[in-house]
Amino acid sequence: MDLILLLGIAVALLVILVTLFFFTKGKGSQESGKYNHPRVENEAQAAPRRAQVVRNQRNRARVAAAPAEEQHHAAADGGSDEDEIPHADFNGEKMGAKKRAKLEAKAEKKALREQELKIREDQKKKDALLEEQRKVEAEKEAEEERKREEAEKKAREEKARQEHEEYLRMKEAFSVEEEGFDQEQEDDKQNMLQEFINFVKSNKVVVLEDLAVQFKLKTQAAIDRIVELQKDGRLSGVIDDRGKFIYISEEELNAVAKFIKQRGRVSITELAENSNNLINLVPVSAE
């Protein structure tokens, strides 16, 4: 930029010198025509004039260089967007037009910046409004989702409650049926036990193994059952060493007791000899 300024100053000086040359030449011609005689100057008088002319040229060069320097400073203040190369111009009207154009350009740029700023602000407001609308929509969707989940939860809870109530009703029904079934089983068990007792009473003498087979029991289970029935007083008798059970009724026991009481002292041999008369060992079905 300094090189351009120097070139401008040099061009301005050159223009001034050329202008002064033609101006001086024209003035000399006019003076020679006015007085109609050649002007003879003294060398002693011409030297100061030449010095004055040189001083005047320098002053005019400084005056011409001042607008160019001002133009350079204005270009520096205007920013990098001013790419024009300043040129020396001595016409005040032309310099005013350039300055006016520059001011108009600055004003236009300022207006453009303000317009862009306004557009950005409007866009920010629009974006903020859209963001607010998105937030409202998101909150609305979240509320609808919450209500939908709550409704689904209530529906699941209601369904679970109904299923639980149905389960309780079915359980109660099964319990009643099971109680009836248990009662039936108990009745069957009592019936089987009574059949067991009746079988022993009717046969009088039963082999324990055959008794177990008859009622689908193990031999030990049959023996245990007889022992329990004896404790309950529902059966009476003895189990001999040959694996048989001899049923003795209440009447027969009373007869044996009466026989022993009448005889006083009775031996086992005497009791065995009279047992056939006291105890009936014949099965009821065979009688």
Curated annotation (Swiss-Prot):
Residue spans of biased composition, Basic and acidic residues class: 85-102
Homology family: Belongs to the DDRGK1 family.
Record function comment: Substrate adapter for ufmylation, the covalent attachment of the ubiquitin-like modifier UFM1 to substrate proteins. Required for ufmylation of Atg9; protects the nervous system during aging, possibly by stabilizing Atg9 and supporting its function.
Molecular-function GO term, any one: ubiquitin-like protein ligase binding
Recorded GO CC terms: endoplasmic reticulum membrane
Species: Culex quinquefasciatus
Topology in the lipid bilayer: Single-pass membrane protein
InterPro entries: DDRGK_dom-contain (IPR019153), DDRGK_domain-containing (IPR050899), WH-like_DNA-bd_sf (IPR036388), WH_DNA-bd_sf (IPR036390)
SMART domains for the chain: DDRGK
Primary subcellular site in the record, as a coarse category: endoplasmic reticulum
Region (Disordered) residue spans: 28-102, 135-164
Keyword annotations of the record: Endoplasmic reticulum, Membrane, Transmembrane, Transmembrane helix, Ubl conjugation pathway
Self-association state and partner proteins as the record states: Interacts with Atg9; the interaction is transient.
Bias type Low complexity, positions: 44-68
Listed name of the protein: DDRGK domain-containing protein 1
Transmembrane segments: 6-26
Sequence ranges on the Lumenal membrane side: 1-5
Signal peptide limits: none
Domain of life, source organism: Eukaryota
Cytoplasmic topological segments: 27-287
